[in-house]
Amino acid sequence: MAKKTVEALGAADLKGKRALVRVDFNVPLDESGQITDDTRIRAALPTIGMLTGGGARVILVSHLGRPKGFDDQLRLTPVAKRLGELLGQTVYKADDVIGPEVEEAVKKLEDGDVLLLENVRFYPEEEKNNPEFAQKLAGLAELYVNDAFGTAHRAHASTEGVARYLRPAVAGLLLQKELEYLGKALESPERPVLAIMGGAKVSDKIQLIQNMLTKVDSILIGGAMAYTFLKAQGVDVGASRCETSTTKKDGTTVDLLQLALDLLAEAKERGVTFLLPVDHRTNDKFGDLADPPVTPDANIPEGQMALDIGPKTEELYVAEVQKSGTVIWNGPMGVFELPGFSKGTFAVAHALAESDNLSIVGGGDSASAAEKAGVVDKLSHVSTGGGASLEFLEGKTLPGVAALDEA
């Protein structure tokens, strides 16, 4: 799925042209409205710099949070200020997304200028992918760049609808990097390929596991989702969090214990190594312990809840990482936010950092864990989109990517 990128545009495509750029500036704010982590703003700098350097007039569009209509707390004013500091130039800020005032602000732009529109989700038309709203957005510019991988799995007006009315429509540098790394891991990886899956709910990762079984040589399971697989095989899970069924959107119930057995059987049939924890670190309640007890085997005693993989499992999983050519990591091995139960997740993170394989970390919790372990700069690629990377790895088409011009 090769898409045309911003790098493919020539000087004539950029100089003096108005470029509408969808970025992901959905950054965390504290109670006083200060940005607590500007990673997502920094991630967009290469694309913005390339466009302004080429003389384009850049119009940025992003969402922030989940507003219900206009909400002063979720205006993009602090983002414009921080972006200006990072770019070393004034970033103009519009008080709206569409309308006469915005059109006036766009008219005033000179080559190399940057204008940030207000939070696009102030308009319910954005998430409804309303064609008129998309058309009004498209009317502001002469070319469209999508650099927001984090929302590429959403068919919204600013991510998908706008590309119907504005050409060229190309991928920004960040989106291009995401597609290259994730695409390589799925289509032409260095073997053997290992998928590390973790997190609390197996129901969130069913499609991911199903798709991975057709792509990888081995799978490691950690986190609370491992207890579903263990319980399905008759292992005692004590008081651990263990999902046994889930309800689909159509109201039907899925027996997750049976599904776990089916997935294990499919792995065996396909010759995929499927590893589960052989020991655990536990507590008698959900909370931290400086030196948690370790189970002698996979069984978890009554009244105890497993909150992390144990040292034997760590060794097993680290060895698997070391012999793999490509590793896709999606989800922590335990409750890594609690220091006493962070060892399993951090052991995996450090093993990835120290090996010379292609290591790809799906966004969300795994990205936070990699950051907390201090290994982000030693990994091949840490995705900026949790939901988007998950859907891409599940084999789904991302609407925000499908809408762009073919290379």
From Swiss-Prot:
Family according to the record: Belongs to the phosphoglycerate kinase family.
GO molecular function: ADP binding; ATP binding; phosphoglycerate kinase activity
Enzyme type, top EC level: transferase
The protein, known as: Phosphoglycerate kinase
Organism for this UniProt entry: Gloeobacter violaceus (strain ATCC 29082 / PCC 7421)
Keywords, ordered alphabetically: ATP-binding, Cytoplasm, Glycolysis, Kinase, Nucleotide-binding, Transferase
Assembly information from the UniProt record: Monomer.
Pathway assigned to this chain's UniProt record: Carbohydrate degradation; glycolysis; pyruvate from D-glyceraldehyde 3-phosphate: step 2/5
Sequence positions that bind substrate: D24, F25, N26, R40, H63, L64, G65, R66, R121, R154
GO cellular component: cytosol
UniProt xrefs under SUPFAM superfamilies: Phosphoglycerate kinase
Localization (cell): Cytoplasm
Residues binding ATP, per UniProt: K205, E337, G363, G364, D365, S366
Catalytic reactions of this protein: (2R)-3-phosphoglycerate + ATP = (2R)-3-phospho-glyceroyl phosphate + ADP
Gene expressing this chain: pgk
Keyword Ligase: no
Positions of transmembrane segments: none
Domain of life: Bacteria
InterPro entries: Phosphoglycerate_kinase, Phosphoglycerate_kinase_N, Phosphoglycerate_kinase_sf
EC number in record: 2.7.2.3
GO biological process, one term: glycolytic process
